[in-house]
Amino acid sequence: MDTAPASPEPFLVTPQAEVLEELIQAQMGPLPRLAAICRLKRLPSGGYSTTDDLHLVLERRRVANAKERERIKNLNRGFAKLKALVPFLPQSRKPSKVDILKGATEYIQILGCVLEEAKVSEKQSPEEQTHSGRPSDPHVSSTRELLGNATQPTSCASGLKKEEEGPWAYAGHSEPLYSYHQSTVPETRSYFTH
């Protein structure tokens, strides 16, 4: 009795590699293809053919990309100039573009308040100005006050206040952003008479 050793289980044959594209094409039909961006001309047969040379299309893309890069550089140069002019920016970190715009807005509002104070003080008589203790050139001193110590309140501004607390308050930074708040209350009129 010759017993042959039991043969091990045969290995499974590995199926041929299948490409997903081929499977989808078999089920769905031809797949859409990515095409270069170019102008197409409709043919009498209903198909389309390109009217542009591929080199011209690529050259137009290069020109458009160069224009966009130059536009972004100009924008960044403008922000750099604005950053140099605005005094109310955080010094402990590099301010973002949003910080620069907020600081510029606050600065413009404060300068507007200084101009309003100057107009009001010009309308006052010289006696009232000396009694109020203001110097002869009030808008210059107000500007110096605001620029010298931004947290010192004036008659037009209640100072710079921290934005409301919360996870969004510091925009991912450890230093708070500051915003300008006017202390004047808007006038309300009653349209009903009793």
UniProtKB/Swiss-Prot annotation:
GO MF terms held by the record: bHLH transcription factor binding; DNA-binding transcription activator activity, RNA polymerase II-specific; E-box binding; protein dimerization activity; RNA polymerase II cis-regulatory region sequence-specific DNA binding
Gene Ontology CC entries for this record: nucleus; transcription regulator complex
Polar residues composition-biased segments: 139-157
Lipid metabolism keyword on record: no
Key words, A-Z: Developmental protein, Differentiation, DNA-binding, Nucleus, Oogenesis, Transcription, Transcription regulation
Gene Ontology biological-process annotations: oogenesis; positive regulation of transcription by RNA polymerase II
Cell compartments where the protein resides: Nucleus
SUPFAM superfamilies, sorted: HLH, helix-loop-helix DNA-binding domain
Region Disordered, residue ranges: 121-163
Tissue: Expressed only in the oocytes within the ovary and at lower level in the testis. Found in the resting oocytes of the primordial follicle cells, at the periphery of the ovary and in the hilar region. Also detected in growing oocytes, but at lower levels.
Null mutant phenotype: Females display a defect in the formation of primordial follicles leading to infertility. Although embryonic gonadogenesis appeared normal, primordial follicles were not formed at birth, and massive depletion of oocytes resulted in shrunken ovaries and female sterility. Null females do not express ZP1, ZP2 or ZP3. Since its expression is oocyte-specific in females, Figla is a plausible candidate gene for primary ovarian failure in otherwise phenotypically normal women. The gene for Figla null males have normal fertility.
Record bears the keyword Nucleus: yes
Biased composition (Basic and acidic residues): 121-137
PROSITE patterns: BHLH (PS50888)
Source organism superkingdom: Eukaryota
Main location: nucleus
Cited function: Germ-line specific transcription factor implicated in postnatal oocyte-specific gene expression. Plays a key regulatory role in the expression of multiple oocyte-specific genes, including those that initiate folliculogenesis and those that encode the zona pellucida (ZP1, ZP2 and ZP3) required for fertilization and early embryonic survival. Essential for oocytes to survive and form primordial follicles. The persistence of FIGLA in adult females suggests that it may regulate additional pathways that are essential for normal ovarian development.
Protein name, entry field: Factor in the germline alpha
Source species taxonomy: Eukaryota, Metazoa, Chordata, Craniata, Vertebrata
